[in-house]
Design a protein with these regions (language model features):
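Sequence-level preference for short, compositionally simple segments enriched
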Residues: 1-284
Length: 284
């Protein structure tokens, strides 16, 4: 069609390094089959799609291609910071052949608004300790551990869709970082035949994951959480819930090592300073 660039990679090469002013890249609808890396020198850029359903960045690498491993399978890798993505679909459309990452983040202060993340195992890898991410009004789907990694990330008003009986999150929050994954006002849905999904299992011992005021379908199993075959993780994992609704939110048979938060506990999750105080002040 008409535009200044034909691919995202071309568009990025037209942007100056470490800019102190904001640049907006408008992405016309279409299917962009490319593996995109936004390098660490890219900052202060907004990528805005024309329409989330029809503006698709897709690739199909998976972990079992030539010993590729999980961490090189991404469709979109974001190494830059202070970048916003809006109205885009990021997809890894590999068949179910092992880990296949759609989004891999390394940068800080990344915001995703009204985006869709499509894949199977390991859809979103929040890959860097001490980085902060914000997902607003997004749709995220996958099979196993499809939101995983060490970053601090807020998921607000998102739909989290399980395509298989498995685990939603696998946080690897470092011990010295208080906030890992926070799901607020999200809707947890599943494919028709899915009936046994766990909210999370700890990829590392101090995994931190909280669900607040979320609507949980009946596919969420009564125990809620899994210790990843290691009872020692029950002493260290920081898992909590508050005010959730729906059949999957019944905590009568929840594992004993998950914390049920009080209203006072939850109040601090309203504070951007608390959520994102890891380093410099940031209010997305």
């Amino acid at each position: 069609g008409t535009g200044d660039y034909r691919t995202l990679t071309e568009a990025m090469e037209g942007i100056r390094a470490f800019m102190d002013y904001k640049v907006t890249v408008l992405v016309k609808k279409g299917v962009y089959k490319e593996k995109v890396v936004l390098p660490s020198w890219l900052e202060n850029v907004d990528f805005i799609g024309e329409n989330v359903e029809n503006t698709i960045i897709t690739y199909d690498d998976h972990a079992n291609i030539n010993k590729m491993g999980t961490f090189r399978t991404y469709t979109l890798k974001v190494e830059g910071s202070s970048i916003t993505f809006k109205n885009l679909t990021i997809e890894n459309n590999a068949a179910r052949l092992g880990q296949a990452v759609a989004l891999h983040t390394e940068g800080d202060r990344l915001v995703f608004i009204n985006c869709r993340f499509l894949g199977n195992q390991d859809t979103i890898y929040t890959g860097a300790k001490g980085t902060r991410l914000c997902f607003l009004n997004c749709y995220i789907e996958g099979t196993t551990d499809f939101i995983f990694g060490p970053s601090t990330a807020l998921f607000h008003n998102c739909t989290i869709h399980s395509k298989a009986n498995s685990y939603i999150t696998a946080a690897s929050t470092p011990k010295d970082i208080e906030v890992g994954y926070v799901f607020k006002n999200c809707k947890l849905t599943a494919a028709p035949d899915v009936d046994k999904v766990y909210l999370g299992r700890p990829w590392r011992p101090y995994a931190a994951t909280v669900f607040i005021n979320c609507e949980m379908g009946k596919h969420i199993c009564p125990a809620g959480w899994d210790n990843w075959r290691n009872p020692e993780n029950e002493k260290t994992a920081r898992y909590a819930e508050y005010g959730n609704t729906g059949e999957g939110a019944d905590n009568t048979n929840r594992v004993k090592w998950v914390k049920q938060l009080t209203r006072k506990d939850v109040a601090k999750y309203e504070e951007p300073d608390y959520l994102f105080k890891i380093c410099s002040e940031w209010k997305p």
